[in-house]
Amino acid sequence: MNKVGFFRSIQFKITLIYVLLIIIAMQIIGVYFVNQVEKSLISSYEQSLNQRIDNLSYYIEQEYKSDNDSTVIKDDVSRILNDFTKSDEVREISFVDKSYEVVGSSKPYGEEVAGKQTTDLIFKRIFSTKQSYLRKYYDPKSKIRVLISAKPVMTENQEVVGAIYVVASMEDVFNQMKTINTILASGTGLALVLTALLGIFLARTITHPLSDMRKQAMELAKGNFSRKVKKYGHDEIGQLATTFNHLTRELEDAQAMTEGERRKLASVIAYMTDGVIATNRNGAIILLNSPALELLNVSRETALEMPITSLLGLQENYTFEDLVEQQDSMLLEIERDDELTVLRVNFSVIQREHGKIDGLIAVIYDVTEQEKMDQERREFVANVSHELRTPLTTMRSYLEALAEGAWENKDIAPRFLMVTQNETERMIRLVNDLLQLSKFDSKDYQFNREWIQIVRFMSLIIDRFEMTKEQHVEFIRNLPDRDLYVEIDQDKITQVLDNIISNALKYSPEGGHVTFSIDVNEEEELLYISVKDEGIGIPKKDVEKVFDRFYRVDKARTRKLGGTGLGLAIAKEMVQAHGGDIWADSIEGKGTTITFTLPYKEEQEDDWDEA
């Protein structure tokens, strides 16, 4: 923040206000004082001049009351006038008798005007009104201000004998006023200087604490709460400093609490498995966590430059305002690592107390597995319904035929009953397989594990199939000639091998080969047990699906051979329950190899009981 200049500061403004107040006060006082003094001096001067004129009038009146002749009177009046003009301020004095004859005058040319008639209207007005005349004016010739006073001279019986005319200079009066004005101006200037200094000092007592608070506010903006404002007194500014320090402590506590909550929230968001996206009120992304980046398969830099509608791929059908009003969750399909991922997005509006919307929170869940399970469940129900409907439909048709009289036909009745029996057994197998899978799904199963010599165990199973097989298929055994022990449930692994070998025989052509192998991986302590046929094989796109429930590569042929599509699914559950794994390798048209693993031990002290 830039420093405030002196002429823009409070200190200058306070000082200026003080100075202006003094100037206004001194102007008002000065004008009033000067006017009053001027009036007083002029009034005193007029009174003094009138007093002298009255004295002069008295002497002239006495001369006219004397018995002297007119010539003597005129000489005495001239002498009296000359004595009166010895005063510096009297510039001119004249006496005119009632016949308008100038008896005497103090003008330089007074002798010339003496004895002459005057035509000045002032004397006519005085003689007619018997009133004095007084006027002030500025003489442009001499450039001085003068006072003109004319007064009638009357006897005791109020008879006018003449009039006195006086012109007196007022420069002394105005010189005194000039001196007074100079003194007043000097005093005002000195008062202004003292006021300015005092104003600066007083302003600093206010601005210094305010400047300290300003510095503290700047430190608060930087996050520094350690600095305190100094308290200079107990007045309002001191109380403000105390309040400011209290505010600093409160802000520090609030900042610490907010920072703690922010860190907690950041930790929660960072370690959430769900994706979280936050936007501002315009829909621009301001925050998103790592799971959101991973789920959307986008970099953080790219995401922060996109609006949320574009990031979620909704820009063609939705605006940000539509998402704000969105109440239900949405499903998105994102292609990630060449796989389709299904995401569920829930939106929550960030809203202030007064209702203003500040942004949007989007929480993203990966529901690919859930959707897959829902799809599998739907397919499972459809498959079960289909598998049960087919034999039930067949049984119903044959039973209706028998009920309509076919039971009396000795050739048809046994065949219809055999078909009905076969379909019944098929449904029983299907239900048993479903119950077995249900137990695996609910973990409601128990194994009777025991240590078995796997080579001998597998040889017995192969022997059984070799004796009961109907096809002309040759069995090839690639079995190790050493003792290898596994801890298994014989019934369950027998069922696994039965399912695998049965499938190999079903799809093997006449004259084909079925190869049985056991390979040992000593590092992993695993046995690799495989059954290879030379059947029709499995298309490459379907190899991973053969262990799915109800999956058949050739549905018509599998159903014809009596399969339910659950054998390999059950085998997978059983092998995984024994800590192993199972998979298929196939080349279409050349055959299929089913391999599963089991943990083993090289030796076993306990005696092996033959099955």
UniProtKB/Swiss-Prot annotation:
GO terms for molecular function: ATP binding; phosphorelay response regulator activity; phosphorelay sensor kinase activity; protein kinase activator activity. Its main location: membrane. It catalyses: ATP + protein L-histidine = ADP + protein N-phospho-L-histidine. CDD domains: HAMP (cd06225), HATPase (cd00075), HisKA (cd00082), PAS (cd00130). Residues 325-379 form the PAC domain. Signal peptide: none annotated. One of its GO terms (biological process) is osmosensory signaling via phosphorelay pathway. The modification Phosphohistidine is found at residue 386. It is a multi-pass membrane protein. Residues 1-13, 204-611 are cytoplasmic. SMART domains: HAMP (SM00304), HATPase_c (SM00387), HisKA (SM00388), PAC (SM00086), PAS (SM00091). Autophosphorylated. Keywords: ATP-binding, Cell membrane, Kinase, Membrane, Nucleotide-binding, Phosphoprotein, Transferase, Transmembrane, Transmembrane helix, Two-component regulatory system. One of its GO terms (cellular component) is plasma membrane. Residues 383-602 form the Histidine kinase domain. It comes from the Bacteria. It is found in: Cell membrane. InterPro entries: 2-comp_sensor_kinase, HAMP_dom, HATPase_C_sf, His_kinase_dom, HisK_dim/P_dom, HisK_dim/P_sf, PAC, PAS. Residues 35-182 are extracellular. Its EC number is 2.7.13.3. Disulfide bonds: none annotated. Member of the two-component regulatory system WalK/WalR involved in the regulation of the ftsAZ operon, the yocH and ykvT, cwlO, lytE, ydjM, yjeA, yoeB genes and the tagAB and tagDEF operons. Phosphorylates WalR. Homodimer. Interacts with YycH and YycI. NCBIfam families: HK_WalK. The imidazole derivatives NH125, NH126 and NH127 inhibited the incorporation of phosphate from ATP at 50 ug/ml. The zerumbone derivative NH0891 inhibited WalK. This is Sensor histidine kinase WalK. It comes from Bacillus subtilis (strain 168). The gene is walK.
